Amino acid sequence: MTTLPSPLTGNPELRLSMIFTGIGDEAAGAIEGQIQATRQLNWKHLEMRGVEVPGYPKGNLHDIPDAAFDLAVRQLESAGVGVYCFGSTIMNWSRRVQDPFDATLAEVKRAIPRMVRLGAKYVRIMSFKPGDEEFRIPAEVFRRVKEVTDRFLDAGLQPVHENCMNYGGMSWQHALDLLDKCPGLKWVFDTANPIFNPDRSRPKPWPRQDPWEFWVHLRDHVVHLHIKDATWNPARNDADYNWPGEGQGRVRDVLRDALARGYDAALSIEPHMVTVFHDAQAKAANNDALMENYLQYGRRLEKMAAELRGRQQKDTGT
């Protein structure tokens, strides 16, 4: 499969090799729809999370049966679409650190050979859902995340932790603590997730996190970017999701800063505007609306990135 470039940090030279990708099940549940969206955008890679293969129920790429996985691989290869990152459910916001660790290790064991077969360099992991009143990371979380990290690294694969509804995402301080305790772990920064997550490093009542502050403290560890934008809605006590650059996620500022620092890895879209992956109450969205939203989101991000890169090249004379 395709060899993927590594992100660069601190290099002012602007490169043209940035990869645009997206979390496939935000475009369609079925593998055919995910491939269709990728090809319509003239992209070459998917970030695969949930997928439905004909004849099998939808599941995460590391959980679907071997026969379903084989079929998915054949369809991807036939279409010339690579998998940039595995959007795994390993230790995610639906799991507690009190759950049996054997189940987590079984997911890791299934994911590794599938990543290798697809040539995926990155696997997104998390660090379990904290209790409502927790503000410290338990030692057992560090132990489990380190073991999972080591298993992927030993296989030549790079785990990346996402700031989300997990212990490592409780604040940028918690994130740095997790990275310190788990050598070799890297970060995937989600621009919108700080908007709806409380900053548990501060006294109660916990304020919501600041996306820019989180980015500035974590950017040296970031090798992958999830592009999502949102605005906090006090009336709903939840986030409303927006086009990139139109919310409070500081998407334009983060992207401008990333480009200035030489970031040339992937920008992966996760619109959330039609359906929210972790919203158990969300109804099945109209397939056409889901697809059209994904395509327009991707085109808007490409336009933003091109404008920022052009302005930066003009300013630096490169």
Language model segments and positions:
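Short acidic/histidine-rich active-site segments
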Residues: A266-V274
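Active-site-proximal loop/turn and secondary-structure-junction residues that shape catalytic pockets
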Residues: G22-G24, G50-E52, T89-N92, S127-G131, ...
